[in-house]
Amino acid sequence: MMPRWSGGWGYQVHYEVINKTDLLMGSNKLYPGFSEEINIMHFEGVYTWKKEIRIIAKLPYVLSAEREMPDGSGGKLIQKDSGWGDLNLGLPLKKYFNLDGKSGSSTFKPMVRIPLSKKDDYDFYYKEFGVGLGFGHEFETANYYFGIGTAWWIFDGNRPAEIHSSLDFGYNFE
């Protein structure tokens, strides 16, 4: 989805389903026997000014979210959520390299998260303003791909800071 030419753009839409049983807090069963089901449509787009500078936008729409919680008297309380999630905007700044048999890029990405709806009892998305920084490095050869990245977010509110990381490997079967 990342066009590398000046004036290039792209978009994608994808659907995500999340089903959870025995709601967890870390690895501990916080609410055994309770479940959560979430259906999300993700809208994502990119525009490239120059191959090194682009803007990305990610906007999720929660089609339906339902979570079972204890009601305090031995029963189940069902919480529901739907609607727009938080708009994420990023400005990936890339440095490309081409070496003998290997090419890739390093990325520095400032980000902002903008809440589009009000907080309620069950918020699948944060619904708090946030800023973040992302860093990444990836390279590929004729047969292999390697990527590593991390992002750090801080929020304006009660939500604690977060760090997300990924490590990706790939093989070209052609």
Describe each PLM feature range.
Residues R159-A161:
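Low-complexity, polar/charged sequence tracts that form flexible coils or short amphipathic helices
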Residues M1-D121, K127-I148, W152-F155, H164, ...:
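Transmembrane beta-barrel domains of Gram-negative outer membranes and organellar outer membranes
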